[in-house]
């Protein structure tokens, strides 16, 4: 059934917007468009901070950046998932997981750790394994 929903994930608090866009782009068929700020279909017409493109087409799903009770900015997935072929909870969790992976990699590299991108693996349970090395 078509309706507007919002979905949050604590891992998407205090996000770096450029790193978030990079993370979304790593998910097959998905892209984040910061220039397209209106999502709509027959049932909804909402303003967002960025919209999603899925398989090259804008869909009625986007991101809003809201301030939570602690005063921190958090990315909230909002929109109408009906007919997109996407699941709101799975999508939000996948974005959060890939974002956290990229955040760990960025933090390690800033601290002069070496990460072989080819050695990053995903376990059968979905956990991402990153090996970081530091030479003395």
Task: Give the ranges of each region predicted by the language model.
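Interaction-mediating elements
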Residues: 1-136
């Amino acid at each position: 059934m078509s309706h507007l929903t919002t979905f949050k994930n604590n891992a998407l608090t205090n996000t770096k917007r450029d790193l978030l866009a990079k993370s979304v782009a790593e998910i097959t068929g998905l892209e984040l468009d910061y220039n397209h700020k209106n999502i709509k279909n027959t049932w909804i017409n909402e303003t967002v901070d960025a919209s999603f493109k899925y398989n090259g087409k804008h869909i009625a799903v986007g991101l809003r950046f809201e301030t939570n009770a602690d005063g921190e900015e958090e990315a909230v997935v909002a929109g109408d998932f009906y007919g997109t072929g996407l699941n709101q909870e799975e999508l939000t969790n996948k974005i959060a997981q890939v974002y956290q992976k990229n955040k760990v990699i960025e933090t390690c590299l800033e601290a002069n750790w070496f990460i072989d991108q080819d050695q990053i693996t995903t376990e059968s349970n979905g956990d991402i394994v990153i090996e970081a090395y530091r030479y003395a």
